[in-house]
Amino acid sequence: MCTSGQIIGSLLVLSVLEIGLGVSSVAVGAVSFSLALREHTPQLGDSSPFLLCGICGILCAKKKSGLVMILFSACCICGLIGGILNFQFLRAVTKKTSSLYPLHLASMSLACIGIGGCTVSSWLTCRLASYEQRRMFSEREHSLHHSHEMAEKEVTDNMSNGAPQLIFNGRVQSMF
């Protein structure tokens, strides 16, 4: 079983990968846009949700709060959907004879890698949330057990008043 540190480390690596994919996708989209303007063909833009997903992943790994994990999961799902739609759109309009074919192929490759990264990031976020939930439950249980022990000790200290007493089945009984 993975520890929290291993999950967070993996999440950070994937988030940096997603940021890299996002920046690369934006660069490929910009080159594609400039070439499309010269050829008077419609631009097949690559709006990259992976950049936002990567930034939220780094925030999630640092904060580890429930709301940030939910935000990151939502970004991963949006990145997944955006990557699938982008891939399908590019696959449908790409022609091998087009001068933009290498850029479309690069965009489709980045989308596939981004889809895989978003899928693994979503899974890791669920693992991290599960780990944090178990940790919080354990802390609460320990705190409750400790406060119960302290309350029991306080009761016995208050009732002793210097006279010897016995405790039977949780009840304090004076010997005199």
Curated annotation (Swiss-Prot):
Record GO biological process: negative regulation of canonical Wnt signaling pathway; negative regulation of cell growth; negative regulation of cell migration; negative regulation of cell population proliferation; positive regulation of apoptotic process
Organism per entry: Rattus norvegicus
Give the gene symbol.
Answer: Tmem196
The reply on keyword Transmembrane helix is yes
Query: What does the record give as the function of this protein?
Result: Acts as a tumor suppressor in lung cancer. Inhibits tumor cell growth by inhibiting cell proliferation and migration and promoting cell apoptosis. Inhibits metastasis of lung cancer by suppressing beta-catenin expression in the Wnt/beta-catenin signaling pathway.
Q: Where are the transmembrane segments?
A: 11-31, 41-61, 67-87, 100-120
Localization of this protein: Cytoplasm; Membrane
UniProt superkingdom: Eukaryota
What's in the keyword line of the UniProt record?
Answer: Cytoplasm, Membrane, Transmembrane, Transmembrane helix, Tumor suppressor
Q: Please report the name of this protein according to its UniProt entry.
A: Transmembrane protein 196
